[in-house]
Amino acid sequence: MGQSQPIGPLPVLIIEDQPVLRIEVADMVERAGFIPVEATSVDEAISILETRTDIRIVYIDLDMPRGVKGIEIAAAIRDRWPPIEIILTAATFAKADLDLPVRAEFYSKPIHHGDVIAAMRRMAADTDRRGCDRPA
């Protein structure tokens, strides 16, 4: 009988334009056993997703001030890379006001690290079970 090999720590793409918040989230992600991959803009995030086919979880700040809004990038990620799991956060939006992409989870800021880490672990387990290969 074949057994699947453990995949090791998964990378989590963090899309956050505020340096202090990005560092805080990266630390949280790393402490939870994931590998933080940081993007400061939507353009940088798309470039990373086009080259890093190992990314299965994306953490997005919806309060991005320039260009494409966080909810729009979340929808674009869902359309282009359906297997990717999405965590959305915001200080200025309420969940009821958002049209969330399928399977996306929303957390109001300030986030509770334990809740977000639990969501990441659940998402990682779900992608592991589904065997989520995705094209670049």
Regions found by a protein language model. Name each.
Residues 91-95:
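Conserved phosphotransfer active-site motifs of two-component signaling proteins
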Residues 1-13, 19-20, 26, 43-44, ...:
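Non-catalytic signal-transmission and effector/linker regions of two-component phosphorelay proteins
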Residues 59, 87-88:
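Hydrophobic beta-strand core positions in alpha/beta domains
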Residues 19-37:
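Two-component/phosphorelay signaling modules centered on CheY-like receiver
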Residues 38-57:
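Acidic, metal-coordinating helix/loop segments flanking the phosphotransfer/catalytic sites
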Residues 16, 90:
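Conserved acidic carboxylate
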Residues 61-75:
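Conserved phosphotransfer microenvironments
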